[in-house]
Amino acid sequence: MPVGVPKVPYRLPGDVQVQWIDLYNRLYRERILFLGQTVNYEIANQIIGLMLYLNGDDKSKDMYLYINSPGGAVVPGIAIYDTMQFVEPEIRTICMGVAASMGSFILTGGEITKRIALPHARVMIHQPSSSYYKDQAGELIMEAEEVLKLRDCITKVYVQRTGKPISVISEDMERDVFMSAKEAKEYGIVDLVALDVDSNS
């Protein structure tokens, strides 16, 4: 039987009475967001909406985006990334579990110096793939051209955000490249490994 979303106590400023609200609403009040599933239009629109609301609420306070995602659709992922660059508050990205494919792309979009991986997190990068299956040859050609444009866009972002040469990024995106938290730091996808007992990272 599903448990549902847990409720936690919360007291509004100035109120004596404690009210119970769902966990996610409580975390949103602390500017904490989650990407804990496959990236699609629905979750992208939810995260974008929250970022825009929090941007309007207070432009000076950082937001925290926790990522545990196997990746997903490219266009919604790019929309999240672009919104992260658009809003005024700095976005701290934290990888827990896995940030693969578009998950790693969003992870690298956090404010540089404020991108974190937990010690046992995994990161994976690769090239975008087509999510459409068309019958007509002309549509297949158009789809292939669009995938190449998206790949070029993603490659340029990784180059800009990691400091790696375009030749390295292009070669690595030819296959699935998995990294530990420490390797992701060395690669430039994250800046810190949190709670690292093996080093002072």
From Swiss-Prot:
The active site is at residues 101, 126. GO terms for molecular function: ATP-dependent peptidase activity; ATPase binding; serine-type endopeptidase activity. The keyword Chloroplast applies. Gene3D superfamilies: 2-enoyl-CoA Hydratase, Chain A, domain 1. InterPro entries: ClpP, ClpP/crotonase-like_dom_sf, ClpP/TepA, ClpP_His_AS, ClpP_Ser_AS. Keywords: Chloroplast, Hydrolase, Plastid, Protease, Serine protease. GO terms for cellular component: chloroplast stroma; endopeptidase Clp complex. Its EC number is 3.4.21.92. It is an enzyme of class 3 (hydrolase). PROSITE patterns: CLP_PROTEASE_HIS, CLP_PROTEASE_SER. Component of the chloroplastic Clp protease core complex. This is ATP-dependent Clp protease proteolytic subunit. The lineage of its organism: Eukaryota, Viridiplantae, Streptophyta, Coleochaetophyceae, Coleochaetales.
